[in-house]
Amino acid sequence: MAPLGSVPRLVLLFSGKRKSGKDFVTEALQSRLGADVCAILRLSGPLKEQYAQEHGLDFQRLLDASTYKESYRKDMIRWGQEKRQADPGFFCRKIVEGVSQPIWLVSDTRRLSDIQWFQETYGAVTQTVRVVATEQSRQQRGWVFIPGVDDAESECGLDDFGAFDWVIENHGDEQHLEEQLGHLIEFVHSRL
């Protein structure tokens, strides 16, 4: 059963490695579709907010792409895993509260339990989108391998997921990316 709030027409669950461009892609989609039609939901938002409260940290600084956030990343991952083990839908329920737009873009789906929760809760309106980028492209965006982060479940949990409904290649070829976004936007419009 869906939590309180509106029932979406489409839920797109975006996943991908760090610096693959998940936020870039979801923000590009929202800018084309409009914020009145399309909401970007971030599972990391309530996780970081709760973590900041419990650890006396600056929540706003945990939201940006800063060294501040990176210095707490490993412990946040561990803490988030403990929360999910106790209640797999904890963060999922938090992000959908009060969302009124018909299209939901979950920009940071990282675990099978997240996909399962959305599929069980919203059924056929849920689709998975994998954003992929070459290691070289990710490095150009500032990615550096960090042991305990890039080899943790939060980065690798969906590597063997199987058949994603959509795969967006974000290797730096703007024209190719635009073509792919165009196809996805056509699909979104078919659901409105």
Curated annotation (Swiss-Prot):
Carries keyword Transport? no
**Primary location class:** cytoplasm
InterPro entries in the record, alphabetically? P-loop_NTPase, Pmev_kin_anim
Recorded protein name is Phosphomevalonate kinase
Gene Ontology biological process: cholesterol biosynthetic process; isopentenyl diphosphate biosynthetic process, mevalonate pathway; response to cholesterol
Q: Which reaction does it catalyse?
A: (R)-5-phosphomevalonate + ATP = (R)-5-diphosphomevalonate + ADP
Record text on subunit structure and interactions: Monomer.
Which EC number(s) does the record attach to this protein? 2.7.4.2
Instruction: State the organism of origin.
Output: Sus scrofa (Pig)
Q: Which segments does the entry list as coiled coil? A: none
**Residues that bind ATP:** 17-23, 141, 171, 180
- Residues binding substrate: 170
Alphabetically list the UniProt keywords. Answer: ATP-binding, Cholesterol biosynthesis, Cholesterol metabolism, Cytoplasm, Kinase, Lipid biosynthesis, Lipid metabolism, Nucleotide-binding, Steroid biosynthesis, Steroid metabolism, Sterol biosynthesis, Sterol metabolism, Transferase
Q: Which GO terms describe its molecular function?
A: ATP binding; phosphomevalonate kinase activity
- Gene name of the record: PMVK
Q: Which NCBIfam families match?
A: Pmev_kin_anim
Record function comment: Catalyzes the reversible ATP-dependent phosphorylation of mevalonate 5-phosphate to produce mevalonate diphosphate and ADP, a key step in the mevalonic acid mediated biosynthesis of isopentenyl diphosphate and other polyisoprenoid metabolites.
Where located? Cytoplasm, Cytosol
Q: In which pathway does it act?
A: Isoprenoid biosynthesis; isopentenyl diphosphate biosynthesis via mevalonate pathway; isopentenyl diphosphate from (R)-mevalonate: step 2/3
